[in-house]
From Swiss-Prot:
Compositionally biased residues, Low complexity: 9-18
PROSITE patterns reported in the protein's UniProt record: HISTONE_H2A
GO cellular component, one term: nucleosome
Annotated protein name in UniProt: Probable histone H2A variant 3
Amino acid sequence: MAGKGGKGLLAAKTTAAKSAEKDKGKKAPVSRSSRAGLQFPVGRIHRQLKQRTQANGRVGATAAVYSAAILEYLTAEVLELAGNASKDLKVKRITPRHLQLAIRGDEELDTLIKGTIAGGGVIPHIHKSLINKSSKE
């Protein structure tokens, strides 16, 4: 029995060694995200664009890279502002409230993201007519 098992392992090693010799000329695969210098998955975004488009699944290769870059930039921007908001409140964890304060505090992001953020609360605001006028006099 030991002879049969040993023979099979030897044969497997030789075929693995042969395939390793063939692969020496090939380069390691490089993802499109790393080629573009992005963290967001270009391949996944490309697949989702193809699934959701009306043009029979025809999406240009650069469209996915551009979309991934835009999403990564907007995410970084929102996370930076939310991190600043959480740091101002002396908290180490970003909550939906911090995201709400960050987005509504920035004029451009506020116009871009008009949806409701669950658990975000409301933005503190006191109308000018309600502020005491006694300090003026």
